[in-house]
């Protein structure tokens, strides 16, 4: 086994690293150890190897470990005058000092230097100063009441070299990481603080792993479970000056991981804004609607949620006992009989507010659908109890329907036994669900998902997981945290509704109250306060703020046939033309107010979609779908037309509308076009909704209902599903000619399972064989360009062909690709100068937007050139002016 070979090599490695060993750091019986710092430490709690080794070495010490680390943290947030910008947490979360006291830390293990290293040589002196202040401040803290805290510094690990073109290059990262590790060693020595040089250790480990064909990180900078397992014994030796314990430690590690899971649920609790932040102060009558006066006893969110936090603390402590017992060679069963009680309250809605739920079939009788359309029930909770509170849906390359089910909404209680799930429905010929498989169980607030290669990305803040079924049983048996640091301050606003762009980038968002910071291999942490949409390249791990804006809750993201996106802020159901305000603007700044592209009749909106299906009439194609759950409870249908550089919307006949008096629980939450061209949508199926209108633990919050419906158009044939799964590259490329947007997306997902070099070679051949007289030639060629983008392979010749297309839609789409290839094509500003002078304002808009990503005043000149094509440069197109103003605001700092 490769891993076994690597671990054997690790024994040999120990002899070459003896110079790194500390004098022999000692832990005393009963001590509490707190880990602070960046994602390296954060991930350690989920792998558990180093902690397991320490318990195995000191089985009678009954040590307590609490992980307080978070991706993106920097030492500047931990000094005597902490800068909150470098330790972002939601409102009233508490300082590092607060948490060290709360966990009664006797010993602090601090992991810094990675995020700081992006400041390069210019930041070294500042880093050393802050590190010195941190040491002095921390050593002056008596967190446990037993004496001042003892400190150990751990350097960052090295970046792992790789020949994978989709990984960040290790060499430039290591040039800085080596300097910052040396700076840590220098400051640690001056402060007489034990220091563990993980940079040197990991560098040696990478070399040995490479000889066995193994990698220890999944993205150059973050360790896999195997990487953590390889690092742990060497870190142990460097810290304690002796060889790590051997033998089978699986049971001990399992106990450690269970304890860490419960602690993570406590420390990174969901809905922190309601647990200890601004909305924790909201109060409601204990007797609910039965309260007789305004002076009746009240109970706040804080009251109840602090009771739950106390339960989580006790649960974690109970699992400490199991760890100690197993470390001593015994066994122990978790005993949670000592959990403190949680206060309860009655609903603030009267009993007669809660009426019996009509069945899914009965509910259809009280729905009105668009003329010619027909609605049928696909699945409901009576048949499939797992289908509770569906929040996102999508069809995979096999034609199966996936649904994220969120019965715990707004979040799990400490004692819940039923967890949230990612479900997979097999459908019959009639389009109805015949079977359900739970792909992922044990989740807490799975607010979004997206298919990726042979697996699925799942949002479960603070993380995005990549989960796969490797043995073919339909259930996930492998998963990896691929993004860390999304805030979970409010589950209403947590990262959600993942959506693919046509070039393989995927988008996710979070809303107000959130303080997100995510680590990447490409620069400092991506940080944002309050609303933002983020752009992630799953293949490369590149991550950036896509639309930082004053959103409350941007739940809606949908792309049209040509890659134009419509963005929806759910709370106010404000809908925007995405290209206008998705240019670069440096954090913490946000884009200014943008006009809505459509005046919505009602709010709020939990999800959006787009009609792209020949099963529906021609005048339905490209219609924007907008779900609504209060007042109007149904799905709006919107005609989308060109409006200069942008788009505009016109309200049409509703797709579906519920009779609020008869089915008040009808709450359409998400939608998707099926492979046969029909439209599916989920019904959240709740009478009581809203975070702040009711206590977070109002007993009226339904945990069991959920429905899926299907809309077809009478008199029109359903589409024959295009076979995607398992098809060869050539057939998948032909599928890119299909008019349906979702079919083309699924074809590109399937293509991503194939070797990129082979896909791109076949794509070049396919593109060369396209008929230039085909009315859709421009779109087919654009799809070829998007396939290149999806596989992260630049083809300048193809790019230039599409940039010069006779179809302005294609030219605009290619300009967007040029923006993301700007660092890999020759003279990108020269290309953009031509686009900025294009006859069509959409192309000029994309050129202006692209200019915002440069760091030179020459880009501003190119952007300004777009005005020359305006009929009246003093009164330009609205979107041109908006985007130009934002671009110049960004570029104004460059001379």
Task: Give the residues covered by each predicted segment.
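Structural recognition of the beta-strand scaffold that forms the well-ordered cores
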Residues: 32-36, 64-69, 107-112, 150-155, ...
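Oxyanion-hole/transition-state-stabilizing segment in secreted/luminal serine hydrolases
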Residues: 36, 46-49, 77-80, 86-128, ...
